[in-house]
Each structure stands twice: as C-alpha cells, then as structure tokens.
C-alpha cells in the first residue's frame, strides 16, 4: 500500500510533528547547507563542545559548516520531539550517520540517520530501523547504479546480511517500493527528491504508512508521482496538506 504523504514548505519546527513518530511514520527533513531553520548564532549555541570542535577542525571548511548546520537542525528537531531544550540532549554517534539520544525515555526505540550529498542535508527519523543511501554521482543516471544506492539504504537499515542485490530491485520503477529480501524480511524503499546535479537519495524502513516531509518547496520534479497521484505542497500559510495515494 502506497503511504500517505504530508509535505510542509516551512522549516519552522511548529509546522512539523511535535511528538515521536508512530509505528509506520517516517519523518523527513531536507535542508541546504545554509542556516535555514535558525540563525548561525542560535545554531552554534546548541552544539556541544565536541560538535563545535568537529565542525571547526574539519579539513574541508564547507563540509565542516554543513555538519554544524545539520547537527544544529537535528538537535532542534529531536528537542521538539522530546520536549527538551536542544542543547541539553546527549547525542551518541553510531555508524554511518546514525545518531542515538541517551537518557531520553520519550525517544527510546526510534532510529535517526543524517545524510549529506552536495548542498543537501537529509534527516530521517522513524520508530525502528531506518536507513539512508545518499550520494552525489553522475553515474546515478544509470538504473543499475541507482539500484545500488537503494541497496545502500537497505544495508544501512539492517546490515549486510539481507541477501538482496541491485538487480532484485529492478521490478519496479516507482519511487516507493516494497521489497522482500532473502534473509531480512520485508522492507519499504522510498526515493527522496533532490534537485541539483547528480544527487540522489533513498530511505529504507521496515514499514512506511505515512510520510511527513519538511523543506521541499515545490521545485519542479520534486516528489514524482507516487502510485496514481501526485504529491502536493501545502499552501502559503504552511499548513500541511495530506495526500493519500494508492
């Protein structure tokens, strides 16, 4: 079944869910590598000393700035979901961009992953495992290469033992697909719209029934046809509009 989709143009946290995701819900944010959700001063104030050091000492200055923007946004989002100040959260780094929140009962059992490609920052949050495959590569025009990125999202969610192959994903050309892996059960894969040269991303989760997407401003080509309907963005008042497809 194709998931329902809510797209919010605004980056304001008030326009996004203020609670942890329910089973089957996927929360997505797309940000540019610039201060959109808050000012630079506000963002740096909520970062930990280790995060500030990581941003400032990064060998690539642009990537260090992008990390600071993404981490500050993540703290603001998780603080909203947890009902706590962003700078009080204790974040634990895991593998491949995954982040856990320590000592926070309200966020127990959710998975958080942050990905980067070109100018884009994507944050995905769900209850249970979630994976993100995201990169900038001109090869993604090739269907097999695109399927490898989809496979990366699956591996990011459940590890390498799923047994799926890029060719096993060729049966569907839709941006949303449900796949059955030989060894890891059923998974949902969603291609995330990213404008710009050769950027692509796919998110994987065990079950996706509803998607809340923030930061997509209706650029042409965003959110291609899902099932038989096209996702629509919310109006100028930034009130989310839900579109059930399928």
Where are these regions (language model features)?
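Core catalytic alpha/beta fold that binds nucleotide/phospho-ligands
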Residues: 1-246
């Amino acid at each position: 079944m194709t998931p329902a989709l809510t797209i919010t143009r605004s980056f304001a946290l008030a326009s996004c869910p203020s609670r942890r995701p329910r089973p089957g819900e996927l929360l997505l944010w797309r940000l540019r590598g610039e201060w959109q959700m808050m000012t630079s001063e506000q963002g740096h104030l909520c970062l930990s000393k280790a995060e500030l050091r990581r941003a400032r000492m990064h060998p690539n200055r642009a990537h260090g700035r992008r990390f600071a923007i993404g981490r500050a946004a993540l703290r603001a989002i998780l603080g909203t979901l947890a009902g706590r100040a962003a700078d009080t959260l204790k974040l634990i780094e895991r593998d491949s961009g995954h982040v856990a929140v320590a000592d926070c009962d309200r966020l127990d059992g959710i998975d958080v992953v942050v990905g980067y490609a070109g100018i884009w920052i994507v944050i995905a949050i769900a209850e249970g495992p979630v994976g993100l495959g995201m990169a900038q590569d001109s090869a993604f025009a090739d269907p097999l290469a695109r399927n490898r990125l989809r496979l990366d999202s699956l591996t990011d969610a459940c590890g390498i033992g799923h047994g799926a192959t890029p060719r096993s994903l060729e049966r569907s050309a839709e941006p949303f697909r449900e796949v059955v892996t030989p060894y890891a059960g059923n998974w949902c894969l969603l291609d995330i719209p990213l404008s710009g040269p050769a950027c692509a991303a796919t998110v994987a989760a065990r079950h996706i029934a509803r998607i809340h997407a923030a930061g997509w401003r209706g650029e042409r080509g965003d959110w291609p046809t899902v099932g038989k309907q096209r996702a629509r963005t919310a109006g100028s008042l930034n009130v989310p509009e839900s579109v059930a497809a399928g």
